[in-house]
Design a protein with these regions (language model features):
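Active-site acidic catalytic loop and adjacent metal/ATP-binding pocket
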Residues: 46-94
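Amphipathic, well-packed alpha-helical segments that form the structural scaffold of globular domains
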Residues: 43-50, 68, 99, 103, ...
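Regulatory N- and C-terminal appendages and interdomain linkers associated
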Residues: 40, 53-54, 79, 136, ...
Length: 191
């Protein structure tokens, strides 16, 4: 099978080992650039990654894994969009990609906070699956998925070749996703 990197003990173990190894250096790199509130949220996430990575009951989907505007080609015909960069595809929560895309697409956290619930409602409604996947479940998956962009920013910043542009991009990703996770009280899922 082409999708071997899904919800598995191997993946959880890989990330659980990688995060504590790279996170302290990541914090040093971005000290003074990223808010202490986001660092504290990250500390809680890293310390409780085992709780975060527990598979919850409910539907799972194929996640693109890096769904941000840079990885979407918009096509005028039939109102379609083409998703690029599938190297991080995995099985995950149905709203992971939605949370990631929304968090990285708004430069103002207040604008994101004002818009996201209505965007998620519209997305959920378009799926026509209310009987099997309630909006409440989708919203909780969205809130939980708000950590995805932060985790991607931390891990990617520390494993790719370092550049000035990359440092800024990963800082912005971490900030936007971090503010989203804080606003949505995603830390409550770590208890």
């Amino acid at each position: 099978p082409w999708l071997t990197y899904g919800v598995s003990e191997e993946r959880k173990e890989f990330v659980a080992n990688l995060l504590p190894a790279v996170y302290p250096e990541w914090k040093k790199r971005y000290q003074g650039r990223i808010s202490e509130d986001i660092f504290e949220m990250g500390d809680a996430l890293i310390a409780n990654y085992d709780k975060y990575s527990e598979v919850r009951e409910g539907p799972m989907t194929l996640d693109q894994g890096d769904l941000r505007l840079d990885n979407i080609l918009f096509v005028d015909q039939n109102n379609r969009a083409i998703l690029l960069d599938w190297q991080t595809a995995a099985v995950g929560l149905p709203l992971n990609d939605v949370a990631y895309c929304i968090s990285t697409s708004f430069d103002n956290p207040n604008d994101r906070a004002d818009s996201e619930e209505s965007l998620v409602k519209e997305y959920h409604s378009s799926l026509n699956i209310e009987e099997s996947y309630s909006f409440e479940d989708a919203w909780n998956d969205y809130r939980r998925g708000s950590f995805v962009g932060f985790l991607m920013a931390v891990m990617s910043a520390m494993i790719v070749e370092r550049t000035e542009r990359g440092d800024e991009m990963f800082a912005v990703m971490a900030e936007r996703s971090g503010w989203q996770a804080l606003h949505l009280d995603a830390v409550s899922f770590l208890k």
